[in-house]
């Protein structure tokens, strides 16, 4: 079970809302979000309702202002708890749509897709085990996308505007 608390003001001040499960619409509970405390679990928060817009991965810890989670604004409108995973992590990445082309397999974090696989774009992928976060830039920076087990036949399937990928990280409570 997870627990996340959203605060309207920085430094955990102002009106707050505690959440322990997925919530597709946080708008009724607060008008803005400037700080977050994650007491347990790993979470993905979204700038728009229904898990749309920019995504941000949060694990246990304190985030006293939205820059701490690399947010672009104080708008957080939905969240989901990422189920814990205790087994192996495995993903296949492809340089073409529809799970075609050059295939490479990952079982651990990748700080630079370009350095490791000589790719700057991933056009499709298949998450076989565990949940992952895809980052548009190396060193786990830039836009983030949650990848749960399943096939993603094109970059639009994971919500990206293009196939640019810089790094990939396993969703784990501790790093």
Swiss-Prot record:
* The entry's keywords: Cataract, Eye lens protein, Repeat
List the SMART domains: XTALbg
Q: Name one Pfam family in it.
A: Crystall
Q: Which Gene3D superfamilies match?
A: Crystallins
Gene Ontology MF terms in the entry: structural constituent of eye lens
**Superkingdom field:** Eukaryota
Region Connecting peptide, as annotated, extends over: 84-88
Can you supply a Gene Ontology BP term from the record?
A: visual perception
Q: Kindly indicate whether the keyword tRNA-binding belongs to this entry.
A: no
What residue stretches are annotated with the Beta/gamma crystallin 'Greek key' domain? 2-40, 41-83, 89-129, 130-172
Is Repeat among the key words of this record? Answer: yes
The parts of the chain that form a coiled coil are none
Example GO CC term: the record gives: cytoplasm
Q: What is known of its domains?
A: Has a two-domain beta-structure, folded into four very similar Greek key motifs.
Q: How does it assemble?
A: Monomer.
Family, according to the entry, reads as follows: Belongs to the beta/gamma-crystallin family.
Recorded disease is: Cataract 39, multiple types: An opacification of the crystalline lens of the eye that frequently results in visual impairment or blindness. Opacities vary in morphology, are often confined to a portion of the lens, and may be static or progressive. In general, the more posteriorly located and dense an opacity, the greater the impact on visual function. CTRCT39 includes lamellar, anterior polar, and complete cataracts.
Stored PANTHER family: BETA/GAMMA CRYSTALLIN, GAMMA-CRYSTALLIN B
What is the protein's known function?
Crystallins are the dominant structural components of the vertebrate eye lens.
Q: What is the protein named?
A: Gamma-crystallin B
Q: Which organism is it from?
A: Homo sapiens
């Amino acid at each position: 079970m997870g627990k996340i608390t959203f605060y309207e003001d920085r430094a955990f001040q102002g009106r707050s809302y505690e959440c322990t499960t997925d919530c597709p619409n946080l708008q009724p509970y607060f008008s803005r979000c400037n700080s977050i405390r994650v007491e347990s679990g790993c979470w993905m928060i979204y700038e728009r309702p229904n898990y749309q817009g920019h995504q941000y991965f949060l694990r246990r810890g304190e985030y006293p202002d939205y820059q701490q989670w690399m947010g672009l604004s104080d708008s957080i409108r939905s969240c989901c708890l990422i189920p814990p995973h205790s087994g192996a992590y495995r993903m296949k990445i492809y340089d073409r749509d529809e799970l075609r082309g050059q295939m490479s397999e990952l079982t651990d974090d990748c700080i630079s897709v370009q350095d490791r696989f000589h790719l700057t774009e991933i056009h499709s992928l298949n998450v076989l085990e565990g949940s992952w976060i895809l980052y548009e830039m190396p060193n786990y920076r830039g836009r983030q996308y949650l990848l749960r087990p399943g096939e993603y036949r094109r970059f639009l399937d994971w919500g990206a505007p293009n196939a640019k990928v810089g790094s990939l990280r396993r969703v784990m409570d501790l790093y």
